[in-house]
Each structure stands twice: as C-alpha cells, then as structure tokens.
Amino acid sequence: MPPGPEVPVQVWVDGQLFQAEQSLLVEHCGFFRGLFRSGMREARAAEVRLGALSASGFRTALRVLRGERPALAAEDELLQAVECAAFLQAPALARFLEHSVTSDNCSLLCDAAAAFGLRDVLHSAALFIRDGSHELVAQLELPEARAYVAALRPSTYVAVSTHTPTPGFLEDASRTMCFLDEEEDAWRTLAALPLEASTLLAGVATLGNKLYIVGGVCGASKEVVELGFCYDPEGGTWCEFPSPHQPRYDMALAGFEGRLYAIGGEFQRTPMSSVECYDPATGCWSFVADLPQPATGVPCAQARGRLFVCLWRPADITAVVEYVVQMDKWLPVAELCRSQSYGHFMVAHRDSLYVVRNGPSDDFLHCAIDCLNLVTGQWTSLPGQFVNSKGALFTSVVRGDTVYTVNRVSTLVYAIEDGTWRLLREKAGFPRPGSLQTFLLRLPPGTTGPVATALPEL
C-alpha cells in the first residue's frame, strides 16, 4: 500500500536527499500523482530517485509548493526551475515562474519554456517581450520562441472619460473609448459605450483581454446601473452580465486569477467593506472576505501574482493589505504615515508597489510617490515631486518597465529605473474633459478609428 498522506517521502535528486510530505507532492505534481497511484516499488518504499533533475531545481520546487517565494536571479536557477516544472508537471511552480517574468529574465524564460513545453510560462514571457524593447526580442535564441512573440499583439493604452447615460438619439462624444496611437501621436476612437452604461463612479477593469464595467451611477440620486458591461476587442462587441448582489458604486474592480473582484464602494451614501467575486465561466457573483474597514475608491494593484489594496485610515495612515484567495482573508502587509489632501493611487512593478498621493492641501497639484518593497517590507520615497495636473498620475498604467499617464494636455511615459520614474517621452493629451479611467488592451491588427474630437471643458 502507498504510504499515508502524512508519511514523509524520501526523494533522491542529483545525489542529495530531500524529504517531503506525500500529500504535498500528490496535490501539486502530476508526476508524483501518477507514481503513487501506479503501485510501483518506489512508491511502496516511499523512496524515489529522480536522476533527470538538479538538486537546486528540486529544492526550488519544494519551496514554492510550500508557499515560499524564492528569489531566482541566476540563469541556472531559472532554467532548473523551468525543467522541474515541466518534468514534475507542477502548475504551482509554473505559475510562480509566470509571475516572476521581468526584463532581466524574460528572454531566458521564453526560450526555456519553449524548449520544455511550458506553454503558460512561454505565453507570459512572450507577452512581456512583445510590450518591451526590440533588444528583448534580439536576445531570443530559439526560432520557435521568436515566432511565438512575433505572432502576438502589443498592448495599447486605452482611456474612457466620465459618461452617464443619455437618450440614444443624442450624439455624445463622451460615450466613447479611445486608444493612443503612438505612431501617429493621436487618440483615436475605439468603440462607443452601450447606451445604458455609465462610467461615473464605476469600477473598470480588464480580465482576459476584455474590459468590464460595473456599478456606474445615473443622476443626482446616484442610482446604480443595474447591469455590468463587457467589451471584447476581438470582435468589437459588448455583452451584458449581472451586477453584484450588493448594489455599489465608487468601488475598486480588479481582474485577478480569472475572476473579477468588486471591492468596497458605497451605496446610499454609506461606505461598505463587503467584497464580491465574479466568475465569468459561471456568470455568478459570490461574497468573499470583507475588507478590514469600509472603503470607497480604494486603489488596488497586482504584483508577482498577488492582489493588494491600499486603504487610507484616519490620522494619515496608509495601510496596504493583501487578499489571499486560498485563505479567503485580507492580510496586513505594511503601513506608512503620510499626509495627503485627497485621493491616492497605486501601481505595481516587479516586487514594488508605488503609492501616489496628493500633497498637503496648500500644494495639492504636486504628488509624492512612495515605494513599498514587498521583499524587504521597506518604504522609500521617490526623489522630487511629480506634477498631478488634472489627476494625470491617477491614470497610471504599467506596461513592461514603463508607466503611462495622461491628462488633457499630454500623455507622459516614464521609465521605471534606478529607484525613480524618469520621463521617457511625451505624447498627445486626451481630448476630453472629466475624470479618466485607463487600462491596457491588445487590439486586433490594423485597428484604427477616427481621431477623437476635442470637447470643451465642463
């Protein structure tokens, strides 16, 4: 009989002995599931010899399966981890590698994943390369990896301004989404919003290269729009889907691990702490763990496959919390005491969260940016101040190693490097007034549209 789930299994790899729980190996590795179900002698003896793998690669695999997040910087470490993920058929290790892609390792991971048949890792690395510099493509060695990258589409910066439903016969230019045509330095119209859709105080997020809009309001009474709307750029089509069980507006909406999360928000002028999760496969919403406190308009960001929310507490405390799906809990991450006059925003890059906040009330047009290193838990402040005219920094979207921001005057692209944001280039401003929600979409080849018409200030 195979050993019980709590009996340790001895695994010899490259002359080194490892001990691991059978239940852990069976849960996470297709190789060990097949082995222990086979009744082979190694399984009965609770001793396995793996001659094809490296000891350091297997050690990394065990650490990841046990919930650790090892830093893999050396090329050998990355290659051995890819080899282990493929040989052991370990999805958790593959996901860890997907979330570890950076400009430093994307070409290596892309080649290795193509060689070992790890399609999800290949796809994540290739998407990163497609959005990066030409030098990243040049670093690829395998023709199949180069071909895979070439077949992908780059992501495009898209924006939608504040809009509330108007009678269908009225031509309302604000009822459109626009994308930045960087080659022509112009904002072009991508699609019109559905007549019933509102982006005023709505949650907007992307998931699986589709755009979702939830919880906009109409009128002075803030009547919540009853349906959600989903845009698919592949066909340029909209479809409707149910709203959360709890009507809400001014929420955070996040696409994370194949699901949408409607986080906090307000209803009938009452802030809420409840959170709901939407599964597009079933079309159903379900409640998950509440936030630690009621919150509206909370910034959220994803780093290394983790979902973070930034709360603002009395006495100028910024609190970062993380939602852990497996535990269905919000766990505290870090706090920082900083003064701000109104609003804050958050984006992620590699192991860092960047919290953008307005300065004190006498200088609210300037922003300070604080950086939380998720590995060390340390806060640092980016040198200097950043102008936040018309809320430009609150439209920040990270694409590779760059940050896109936009207001009516200009679109500014920053490079994230050497502990700061360095202005890289300037493009055309968004020609519409009002607050903006921004995101990235991969548009079909040849997508074009009329240049967005300028509208007067409200």
Curated annotation (Swiss-Prot):
SUPFAM superfamilies: Kelch motif (SSF117281), POZ domain (SSF54695). This is Kelch repeat and BTB domain-containing protein 13. It is found in: Cytoplasm. Autoubiquitinated. Kelch repeats lie at residues 159-209, 210-258, 259-305, 307-350, 352-400. Keywords: Cytoplasm, Kelch repeat, Repeat, Ubl conjugation, Ubl conjugation pathway. Pathway: Protein modification; protein ubiquitination. The keyword Cytoplasm applies. Component of the BCR(KBTBD13) E3 ubiquitin ligase complex, at least composed of CUL3 and KBTBD13 and RBX1. Interacts with CUL3. InterPro entries: BTB/POZ_dom (IPR000210), Kelch-BTB_domain-containing (IPR052392), Kelch-typ_b-propeller (IPR015915), Kelch_1 (IPR006652), SKP1/BTB/POZ_sf (IPR011333). One of its GO terms (biological process) is protein ubiquitination. Residues 7-74 form the BTB domain. Expressed in skeletal muscle, heart and lung.
